[in-house]
Regions:
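Short S/T/G/P-rich N-terminal loop/turn motif that feeds into the first structured element of a domain
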Residues: 21-229
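N-terminal signal peptide c-region/cleavage motif recognized by signal peptidases
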Residues: 15-19
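Bacterial N-terminal signal peptides that target proteins for export
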Residues: 1-11
Length: 229
């Protein structure tokens, strides 16, 4: 397995966070296909060319393991350092057209949307994630609660990450997506076991009344390419 070093990942993360006057973006394409292996093989091979053509920071694929909105869904994601970078791209520039022409897998594009990245984490080669779609009337209070929860989880030895996105287009506009993850599935599972503990429930109770959980799902993600730093 090709390993993405923590140093490189850290540089990518710091690059995202350094844009004080910019807003990082995730472009997310939801694809439905019966040939998951074929689609993943194409994405892995084409990703280095696609991120270069689109000025993306990174690109990869996530596949639900439970809770998928539709069986056969997969999520092709790209990270951009700013809205400006994301918007200046032609979705079907010559390189994209050329690479898509190589894809011989039957598939349906169910959605193609942008998500604001409001909490970033270092990237890993592969990871396991528990995601929630949440509606909230107070994003700042909710983010503060999530920050407290992540800090306490880590303080108690749970080596997890917590990415947070806000939908910017499509039916998920304004929806918050929380993605708690780990490089090891058992590590993520242990962190989820902590939900039964008093300290966890106390932290969640501080923001539970300000949110409505819409949908939950689990997935496995792979990073296929990162821009040179």
């Amino acid at each position: 397995m090709k390993v993405i070093s923590s140093i490189t990942s850290g540089i990518a993360l710091s690059c995202i966070l350094s844009f004080a006057q910019a807003e990082p973006v995730m472009n997310l394409v939801t694809v439905n296909t019966k040939d998951a292996a074929g689609y993943a093989a194409w994405a892995q091979k084409s990703a280095p060319k696609l991120i270069k053509a689109n000025n993306a920071m990174a690109m990869g694929l996530c596949s639900p393991s439970s809770g998928a909105e539709q069986t056969g869904d997969h999520y092709l994601w790209s990270f951009f350092d700013s809205q400006e970078t994301a918007w200046q791209n032609a979705q079907m520039n010559p390189t994209v057209v050329q690479e898509v022409a190589k894809l011989k897998v039957d598939r349906e594009i169910r959605s193609w949307d942008n998500w604001r990245i409001v909490r970033a984490e270092a990237l890993s080669d592969t990871g396991y994630y528990y995601n929630l779609y949440v509606e909230t009337d107070s994003l700042s209070d909710y983010l503060a609660g999530l920050d407290n929860l992540k800090a306490e989880l880590r303080a108690r030895g749970h080596d997890i990450t917590m990415q947070v996105f806000v939908g910017d287009t499509g039916t998920r506009t304004g929806t918050v997506m929380i993605s708690m993850g780990a490089e090891d599935a058992a590590v993520l599972g242990k962190a989820m076991d902590a939900r039964t503990e008093d300290w966890y429930q106390q932290i969640v109770s501080d923001f539970n009344s300000s949110r409505e959980i819409v949908h939950g799902f689990t997935m496995t993600c792979s990073t296929y390419a990162m821009a040179a730093q």
